Every structure is written in structure tokens, then in C-alpha cells.
A protein has these predicted regions:
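Non-catalytic cap/lid and distal C-terminal segments of serine-dependent acyl enzymes
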Residues: 1-164
């Protein structure tokens, strides 16, 4: 994970600055679908100082899905439901989360598993973290056509082009 935070993210920021002629800090949004949603959420939740937003679609945010009751430090640090449940309510990242645009979305249709998204939503509410957690209907499946629609829906908001 340190390789991502210390090398890949700064390199991506450098490329964005060079390609666009920007000065300063270009915004990065952590984004992913399915397993990529877990990775995006994990990156953003662990280092919101490196990202300007999050869009996580149809993820499973608990390690118990793949590891059952097994837990060690590596598994814990990659299981947002577990580490966010223990996140201090006065952590300095909370104002940072609350000042950025971040959305986690899941459907309730075929192949979707919304329970860990609901768990994260409850944890965020208890901690005063105001991420947009959106649970779509029973017709929304774990599949590319729905993710395409969700990106179209959330992207203008993430870019500040419309209100939530």
C-alpha cells in the first residue's frame, strides 16, 4: 500500500500536471466497481489527504466475505467495515472526508451484496462522516450496464457540476 501512496499517486499527479499545464495539486478521485470498489474505498478511507473524492460501486467492504473469521493486521487494514468501526470519532480525517465529495453505491438486484455497504453507512453515521451512501433498487444488478448508469449519475456531482 505504501508503494501506491508514496510512488504511484504522486506520479499520477505529476502526469496530470504535465499533461494539462497545471500548477499545484491536481485532484484525484478514487474509483472502482466490484473488487475495484473495495480497493478505491480502502485507498480513500485510509488516505483522504491524497484523494479529492471517491466513487465506489457494488463493493464488498468486509474481509469476512473472503476470509471468514480469520483476522490479522493485514486483513484488518484492508477491511473498511472493521477498521472504520474502530475509527476514533475525533480523528483529523473526519473533517477532510466531510469537505470532499465521496459516494458509495450498491444495488439490491442479482449478484449484489449490499450488507457491507449498509454496515459502512451505519458506521459513517455514528462517526459523523457524511459520505453519500446510496442503495439503489432491487432491479439494479452487479453488472456493467448499471455501473455505466451510476457513473453517469454520480460523476457530475463528484466534479461539482450539480448538487446531490
Amino acid at each position: 500500500m505504501n508503494h501506491l501512496f508514496n510512488e504511484i499517486v504522486p506520479f499520477g499527479q505529476h502526469l496530470a500536471r504535465v499533461a494539462n499545464g497545471w500548477d499545484g495539486h491536481p485532484g484525484l478521485i478514487a474509483f472502482g466497481c466490484s473488487l475495484g470498489a473495495l480497493h478505491a474505498a480502502n485507498l480513500y478511507l485510509r488516505r483522504p489527504d491524497l484523494f479529492n473524492g471517491l466513487l465506489a460501486l457494488s463493493g464488498i467492504y468486509t474481509a469476512s466475505y473472503g476470509f471468514g473469521s480469520y483476522m490479522d493486521e493485514v486483513v484488518y487494514r484492508n477491511s473498511p467495515v472493521d477498521y472504520m468501526a474502530n475509527f476514533p470519532s475525533d480523528h483529523p480525517y473526519i473533517p477532510l472526508y466531510n469537505s470532499q465529495r465521496a459516494a458509495i453505491c450498491v444495488g439490491q438486484g442479482a449478484w449484489e451484496l449490499p450488507e457491507s455497504t449498509r454496515q459502512l453507512k451505519d458506521i459513517f453515521e455514528r462517526k459523523g462522516i457524511h459520505l453519500w451512501v446510496d442503495i439503489w433498487g432491487h432491479d439494479v444488478n452487479h453488472d456493467w450496464p448499471w455501473w455505466y448508469r451510476q457513473v453517469e449519475y454520480f460523476l457530475p456531482w463528484l466534479l461539482g457540476e450539480r448538487a446531490a
